[in-house]
Every structure is written in C-alpha cells, then in structure tokens.
Amino acid sequence: MSGTDLVSELSARFGDAVLGEQITRERFPTVWIRPEASAAVHRFLKHEVDRPFRMLVDLWAIDETARKHREGQPPSGITIASHLMSHERNADIRLKIALDAEYPSTKSIAGVFPNAAWYEREAYDMFGVEFELQPHSQRILLPPGWEGHPMRKTQPGRATERPLFNMTAALFDAKEHALAADPEKFGLPTHRDGVELMILNYGPHSMATHGVFRIVLALDGEEIVAARPDIGFHHRGAEKMAERQTWHSFLPYTDRVDYLGGVMGEMPYLQAVEKACGITVPDRALMVRVMLSEIFRIMNHLLFYGTMAQDTGAMSPVFYMFVDRERAYRVIESITGARMHPGFFRIGGLSMDLPQGWDGLVREFLDWMPSRLDDYEGMVLRNEIFRARTKGVGAYDTAMALDWGVTGPGLRATGYAWDVRKARPYAGFENFDFEIPVGVNGDCFDRTVVRVEEIRQSLKIIRQCVDNMPSGPIKADHPLTTPPPRERMLHDIETMIHHFVGASWGPVLPAGEYTGQVETVRGLTQFALISDGEPSSYRTRIRTPSFAHLQMISAVAPGMMVADLVAFLGSIDYVMSDVDR
C-alpha cells in the first residue's frame, strides 16, 4: 500500500476528521487530523491497519505564529506532529493536529503509545501544550520553577535578552525543595503488602548513572518496586540554538548532541539540508563520511564495552580498550584536526580532503583491532561473573521495544534485524557488504554481544572504504556550498552573484519541511527541519535514541535488584547530552 492509498484509507475510515494531506518533498505522507480524533487515528494505525505502524518515533510541537510560508495547511497556532514507523512496510507517516496558540490543549496518546508520555511532557515544557489524561503533566527538561515555555517564538533565544538571574537564599531553598524525591510527585507507591517502601535517590551524582541523571526508586529491601527517571540536568537548548544560527553555523552543535558520536551527529542534519537544496554529494565525500562515521562507531562501542565490564565488576578491560580508542583518535585527529567534535562535514561535502598518508594510518588501525577483540572476548564475554551479571537481566522482547521506541542495538538484541543503513541506505551504504548483528533474548548480555559484533562489522566497512576510495571532488558544485573556482571568479563577476547571499547572510533554504534519518551509535537519530525561506531554521526538531531508551527504565526496572539496575543502565549505552539536548 502506497502513502496515497493509506491517506485514502484514513479518509474513508474517519471522514471529515481527516483534514487532508500536506504537500511536502518527504518520502512519507503528512496528514492533518482533528484533535478530537487523534487517539483513534493513532490506535487505528498501530493496531488495525495492515502491516501496522507499531512505533512512535517522535512527537513534537511547532509554534506557527511567526511562520510566513504555510501554503496549503490549515490554520494553526501550535501544531503537534507525531511521526510513526511501520517496519514491515519500511514506511513512515506523519500526523499533525492544529491547536490554539493561546491555550493549546489536546488529548494524550500515551494510552496508545506508552513512549508518548515523555514527548508530551516535553511539548508542555517547551511550548505549554496541555495533554488531557496525561498522568505526569509536568516539566521534564527544565526545573520545576521555570517560568514560561522557551521554545515559543515570543521567548528570547539568548541569556542576555532575559532578566538578570539572582540566586537568593529563599530561591535556593525553594528549588532544593522542588527537587526533593517526593513519592506523590513522581507517582511512586509508598507501601506494598502493608510494608513501607524506601524511597531512594539514585543519582544524579553517581558513577553508575553515566552522567548527570537520577532515578527515584521505591525499594522493598534491595528489590526495585518502581522507578522514575528524572532528566534535564544536561539540557542546553540545542533546538532553540538552531533558530539563531545559520544553516552552516549550526553544524558544530550537531556534534555535541551525542558528544561520543562525533561526525555521526552531523549526518542526519546534512541529509535534511542537502535534500532541501537538491544537492548531490560527490562519491568521494560520501565514502569519507561513511568511513569516519564507522570509526566513531567503533570508538563509542569500545567505551561501552569497557565501562559495561567495569559496571559488572571487571576493572582491567576498560584500560586496555582506552588504548585502542586512543589509536582510533589518532586516526581521526590526523584526518580532521580534532578528536571528539571535528565539525568535519559541510553542506554538500567535507571541509577538506583526506591528508597524505591517511590510508596507512587507517590500515594500521584495522590490522590492530581484530586480535584485541579476540582477547576481550575471553576477558569479558566468556567471563563467568560477567555472564552471571548480564544473562537474563533487563530483558525485553521486540514488541515491548517497539512500544517504547527502542532502536539501534537495543532493538536488534531482541532478534529484530532493523538497521537504517540496510533498510534505508544513505551516504552510499547500499554499496557496502556488512551484516546486521542480532541477539536472541534481549537482555544485557545480548546488547553487549550485538555491539561487539558491530565493531567487527564497522571494521569490515572501513576496510572497504580504504580499498575502494574514489577520486574526485569533496564538495558539490553548488552556490549554497562552495565558492566558484578562482579562474571563473576572475573571468566575470556574474559567477559570484549566486554565492553572495550565502556568504554574507548564510545559505537560504527553500521554504518547506525536510527530514534526515541515520543509524547513529545509539540508534535512530532524526532531524526534522522547517525552513521559512530564511538563512536560519524556523524549527529544528532533534529526535535522539537515548531519550526514548531512558524512558523505558520505568517499565523494565521493577522486580530487579539494585545491582541489576547498574548492569541494565550500562547496557542501554545512553549519553545524557543525547537525552537532554
């Protein structure tokens, strides 16, 4: 069934509750529906339609009050967009509902997609949208005492535009009280079978939480009865920053959304921007992008591997693996000039070509790693203590993973072979020979095994890049990306006219909506951009895998011991900047 057929089926089923399809350049349909039909339409798409849309990929809000180019769309002050995915169809659909700008309110869909709860809380936090029947209609990324909703167009984007902040003693006490682990506020039980439960703050300053993040636990002895993650301590307003940067100057920020993913964070953003501009990236630039992305995948997974072993009691592996990561960093630094945040990609290509001797450095690393991985298998994966601490711990099946929006190794560990690089190839991944590692039981052990095997597959991809690196340009010949060649500039001034605006204001993208999706180290990362025909983004929505994965803790943790929670958190492999943005 095509996207057009699906829209027709929705119209036949729900009548005038379906307002129509928005014309976009996306590969999936965007359908406007009435707010009162939202839950029913989402339920139909998840449970009743053929080859259903079982995953809510993302849900976000858009402040439409300052937007100039909305041709063909119904009037809306605040728009709620939800992005659904059908893995069986390998297809997506985006639903939109129009709300009033002054008092935006609609019904929650958390009863249909449980992972909608955090996304709806974020829409309330950032835009002030109230969701009826939402059990926790409270802030999620900002502190409880925050005034206003910062993603509204009436809110300033710079700290210098806000009143001077002064932390008085009274304000400090109020904020400290607001962050107390109140069971009622977090929806935690206080008793079980007549026994009073202990409420424990797990984090935010704990090595086991892998970042500034806490979980409020209700414990019966060492057993976890209920768990409520509390996030936002690392929030930096990445989506708001995008609205005051040009399309070019926002690129360095994408590296820092997942600060361990390196250049991989640039890929979905560039994918969307290049789609908007109609830019064809040269083959050499695409292959360099793939090679560097896979090197960063290896570096991330080595960090995961070592810290996962450390979390379960093995101290030595992490030190060996940091030696390997340092070798990889030398390769990255030699090619890009930086280590963690290269900012190496550009709209239409790369910032510079590969240096002389790059292939020798990469081959040396490729020859080094396989025997090291064999050694680590004995140290970690065949270690009886590690197996006892991880087998059968934190297990969930594919249906549960899809319900909670789990992607990447966390989904593949359940036995579901879904990888964006294979299902929806980008950057030339269709030309590479590699396998998708999968698990069986979906537990901590399988999540570790999947990532270890992904290291081997990434080595295989990188070797193909080295062996088959094409010659040619590293940037597209396009006025939004590259100045004309000097010989043409000196010939006549006309060659500079198209480049003038892009160089002075920043590139101007055609008005419209554009989406980029890639398989980053943690799973599906999606950038949904709105251009209003200006040098800056009107709305940049960043869907990160870690945000979805942490929400699942409340569903998986009950019944575990506290020590098992440490292993489970390590196996998720989240990064708090990826969660909080």
Swiss-Prot record:
It comes from Rhodopseudomonas palustris (strain BisB5). NDH-1 is composed of 13 different subunits. Subunits NuoB, CD, E, F, and G constitute the peripheral sector of the complex. It is found in: Cell inner membrane. HAMAP family: NDH1_NuoCD_1, NDH1_NuoD. It catalyses: a quinone + NADH + 5 H(+)(in) = a quinol + NAD(+) + 4 H(+)(out). This is NADH-quinone oxidoreductase subunit C/D. Its main location: membrane. Residues 196-581 are annotated as: NADH dehydrogenase I subunit D. Its EC number is 7.1.1.-.
